[in-house]
Amino acid sequence: MNDFKSIIGKLATGVTLSREESAGAFDAMMSGEATPSQMGALLMALRVRGETVEEITGAVAAMRSKMLRVTAPADAVDVVGTGGDGSGSVNVSTCASFIVAGAGVPVAKHGNRALSSKSGAADVLAALGVKIDITPAEVGRCIKEAGIGFMFAPTHHPAMKNVGPTRVELATRTIFNLLGPLSNPAGVTRQMVGVFSRQWVQPLAQVLKNLGSESAWVVHGSDGLDEITISGPTFVAALADGKITTFEITPEDAGLPRAGADVLKGGDAEANAVALQGVLDGKPSAYRDVALLNAAAALIVGGRANTLKDGVAQGAQALDSGAAAAKLKQLIAVSNAAA
């Protein structure tokens, strides 16, 4: 543990860690080699100074090296948010995932239970009847047979159990809130990632580029949402062809009307499940619009759409034809057929 002590000593003087040093430190934490006080010191030193792209890249590499992997097609996408935006909104990325799958792009969705809302991806999917506590092989079967699978983070990241108690005791946001969405167990290289703060939009796109992502959008809504919002502009860093570009988009760019963030307020898992099913059943609402907008971006990332308007049109077709709703039914059936 001398290496860990020297790393904490470096951080105490304000020195930033190299990618390799960060990977080594996070490997030690997730292997159970670091003590709780050492972990707390490192996490808070990074939080207070602000984590660098190299430090996050190393930490994600360590987390990915320990995860239980899932087999998925090369063109699979993930639509995921960091959570922790404090909005308590409906489950946008989860709903968008079924739309994307309904439009013909395989989805390897990674998620967890609620962080700051009453209902995270795992909560709402369980309420809809999806079996979430299945093995990596069974998730792979879901993706193959249903075109969408859900990877429940605790199942695929068992090493996180060594860090969990320290995170709970710190009771504040740490680098781990950023690592989960970047550590997809299916190894997807096409990601739509929502973040809780604008400051992370460009850096996380750079991290994904460092780690070999082919195509990605990292987004933050101007109203604070860790998704693309319909209440105003959304800040985007897009990775394509090895280059990162930053820009803003609005609902109007996709041909969608604006709506206040308040209309996207969610409830508990059961209430959010009813709302999500309503969108899949073709009911018009602001929830449908925001899900379509996020699905459109994911379809661009997945190489299926060229513009947001094109993506919205494909997503609307997936909803109105019943294809998106069929994906949920298939996921429920295949996941529950698991032993």
From Swiss-Prot:
Homodimer. One of its GO terms (molecular function) is magnesium ion binding. The gene is trpD. Binds 2 magnesium ions per monomer. Pathway: Amino-acid biosynthesis; L-tryptophan biosynthesis; L-tryptophan from chorismate: step 2/5. Its cofactor is Mg(2+). This is Anthranilate phosphoribosyltransferase. Anthranilate 2 binds at residue 167. Mg(2+) 1 binds at residues 93, 227. It is an enzyme of class 2 (transferase). Its EC number is 2.4.2.18. Keywords: Amino-acid biosynthesis, Aromatic amino acid biosynthesis, Glycosyltransferase, Magnesium, Metal-binding, Transferase, Tryptophan biosynthesis. Gene3D superfamilies: Nucleoside phosphorylase/phosphoribosyltransferase catalytic domain (3.40.1030.10), Transferase, Pyrimidine Nucleoside Phosphorylase, Chain C (1.20.970.10). GO terms for biological process: L-tryptophan biosynthetic process. Catalyzes the transfer of the phosphoribosyl group of 5-phosphorylribose-1-pyrophosphate (PRPP) to anthranilate to yield N-(5'-phosphoribosyl)-anthranilate (PRA). One of its GO terms (cellular component) is cytosol. InterPro entries: Anthranilate_Pribosyl_Tfrase, Glycosyl_Trfase_fam3, Glycosyl_Trfase_fam3_N_dom, Glycosyl_Trfase_fam3_N_dom_sf, Nuc_phospho_transferase. It catalyses: N-(5-phospho-beta-D-ribosyl)anthranilate + diphosphate = 5-phospho-alpha-D-ribose 1-diphosphate + anthranilate.
